[in-house]
Amino acid sequence: MERQQQLLAAYQQIHSLSSQMIALAQTERWEDLVELELAYVTAVESTAAFTGQAGPSMALQELLRNKLQQILDNETELKRLLQQRMDQLKELIGQSTRQNVVNSTYGQFNDRALLLGEPQIR
C-alpha cells in the first residue's frame, strides 16, 4: 500500500511541476521554465521506473489515469505556449535579418545605419 501512495505522490509531483511550468510560460519567465524542466524530466524518469515496480490496484489505476490526463492536458497547453514563443522569436529574427539587409544595402550611402521605420534626415 505504501508503494501505491508513493506512486500517486509521484504523479501528483509531476502534475504540480507541469502546472508550475505553465505558469512560468504564461508570465514569460523562460529561463526559470528551462531550469524547472530539468526537475520535471527527472521526476518523469524516476516515476516511470517506479511505475513498473508498483503494480497499482484498480482504484489507484483510475486515480492515476485521471492524474495522467491532467498532466497530458498541461503538456498540450505548454506546447501551445512554447509554439507561441517560438513564433515570436521567428518574427524577431526575421526583423533583425531585414534590418541587417537594409543596413548593408543603404548604410554605405550614409554615415549611420538606418532603422526600419525611422524618418530619413536629408
Curated annotation (Swiss-Prot):
Pfam families reported in the protein's UniProt record: FliT (PF05400)
Subunit structure: Homodimer. Interacts with FliD and FlhC.
The protein's role, per its UniProt record: Dual-function protein that regulates the transcription of class 2 flagellar operons and that also acts as an export chaperone for the filament-capping protein FliD. As a transcriptional regulator, acts as an anti-FlhDC factor; it directly binds FlhC, thus inhibiting the binding of the FlhC/FlhD complex to class 2 promoters, resulting in decreased expression of class 2 flagellar operons. As a chaperone, effects FliD transition to the membrane by preventing its premature polymerization, and by directing it to the export apparatus.
Alphabetized Gene3D superfamilies for the sequence: Flagellar protein flit
Region feature FliD binding, mapped onto this chain: 60-98
Keywords for the protein's UniProt record, in alphabetical order: Bacterial flagellum biogenesis, Chaperone, Cytoplasm, Repressor, Transcription, Transcription regulation
Annotated GO CC locations: cytosol
Protein name per Swiss-Prot or TrEMBL: Flagellar protein FliT
GO biological process: bacterial-type flagellum organization; negative regulation of bacterial-type flagellum assembly; protein folding
Family (UniProt): Belongs to the FliT family.
Domain of life: Bacteria
Localization per Swiss-Prot or TrEMBL: Cytoplasm, Cytosol
